[in-house]
């Protein structure tokens, strides 16, 4: 209710309410303040406010979500507002509001089923309720993972848990979720690589923080290779198709050179875990962890190609 909170600005995604999971690329995107969002959220339907970006959407038939908002990437006003109320030290975590991520949305807003590739997740529910469906990493084969849309550090499921289709994804019927409803004051610990689908049951505000684990360096190396492959393939497609491969959070297609630099960094960290990533270059001659040729040789090794063919054949059944 404070003027400082009402003036906070960010990007929101909006979509009609419905019974199926919505991908981010299928949403409307708009820039608005928290105050404009709250005026719309409290309305009974449409609002008569030409200056409010939400005015063209009927509140009764649409949801809105400001999700995955890293406080460090927002204006300093966000950190100033959250700093007095968000802290993780009581959980033995040396992080604060500036390290957190904000999720604010109306009932029906949701995040598709996905798996974070590194870190464990701590989630604090500040307002409203959220439903979480969690699946063990052992369920991965039943959830039909995909990297399209591509988002760094996220592996999505092709299964729509809101409207599952066992005829297309028969193994999904065997998946056993753990359902949790978070209420204000609750904190949820999401173990590494656990799949999760999240839906707001009311207008909801939550914050989370990811905590590094000792084996994250290996997962970052895998993510770097995934980015190289996606960059290489998407770059050879038409601009429209290539963009369709990317989640909106990615911003655009990286160049192959940029992706290789990230891979170089990731593998160098595997060699030297305590190395300050700001203190070395990305040129292979600067003690690089691998050469581009070595990467090509690894990806095209006969045993790797055999596994790829086997996976492709399984996907046709």
Locate predicted features.
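N-terminal accessory scaffold of Fe(II)-dependent oxygenases
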Residues: 1-187, 195-317
